[in-house]
Amino acid sequence: RDYIRGRSGWCVSVALAEGSEIVFAAMYAPVTKQLWVAHKGEGTTCNGKRLFASTRQDFSGARVPTDALPKVDRDLEMVHKPNSIAMRMTMVACDRADLVATLRWGHEWDIAAAHLIAEEAGAVVTDATGGTIFYNKPKPLDFGLICCAPGIHDAAVDRLKGRAEAILG
């Protein structure tokens, strides 16, 4: 949608999987001329500069790229939200956000590259209940996403798990 509207919050992303795991990822945002690259076990770079994810320890006050927060989450801090979930995940990878979370079904190809980019920068990436996300499944869908600083992952899961389970039934 951002591409169609002439906004900057979109990118092209490519990921290489071996089995159920992403081992190489690249994302390019043409408008901002940012190129993220990650190799499993070798870290993440953006335009050649090594990235390090947020090291936040306190959940309250965490920076979240969103347009609005539910009343129960008003202890969090809103920051600019690009439309692309992958671009939001790179915000955690480069310490411009502390938490990206969704409670909806999504295709693995939308997050595969950003998943490795965020993890190799030091972030934690799981589904909305804290479970591992596997790739190359027969049904390439997962419910929800948490991408965040390691120090707030448990609190994020605690905050979202009940909501996720209520949606899933």
PLM feature spans:
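DPxDG-like acidic metal-binding loop motif
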Residues: 1-45
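Local beta-strand/beta-hairpin segments that build beta-sheet-rich folds
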Residues: 23, 51-52
